[in-house]
Amino acid sequence: MLRIFLLCPLLFLSACGGSDKRQQVGIESPSTVEDEIESTPDSFDATFADGMTGAVFQHYLKLRTALVNDDGGDAAAAAGNLSESLGEDYPDLKMAATVIAATNDVAAQRAAFGAMTEEIEPLLREGITGGTIYKQHCPMAFDNAGADWFSDAERIRNPYFGDRMLTCGKVVATLE
């Protein structure tokens, strides 16, 4: 009888908690996934007629990457470096870079980045001597007004939405 009395609780515990069937719930977050964090390459395929244009494009890529990663601090630093790299012949481009460098607010930086992209296009178009720069477009940016950006790769990494819509966009032109 004592034996049955001791075995009953053991059977009860093993019956209630001994199941190997476990429900697994996977949570996938579209935000910070290690593989999706964009990085700026140390070099790119495009070559330019002068060192200033190459430096400006490198800082532009770092700025774009910071916006893709929703990193206002890195975006401000890259914009400051871009502004310092510019000559005096590009006051509107320099102003857009200064606006971005003056804040860590990613939404404000993205708005100024759209204006910067419009201003930087003639510099890149006139200065590229080799390789390819991809002009990309997101039709949903700024309440469906759309906005462009430049990239050193054909792969879409959207600076206007970051990880919320990382691959929204398409290549609309190439500069060669």
Give residue spans per PLM region:
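Bacterial signal peptide processing site
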Residues: 16-20
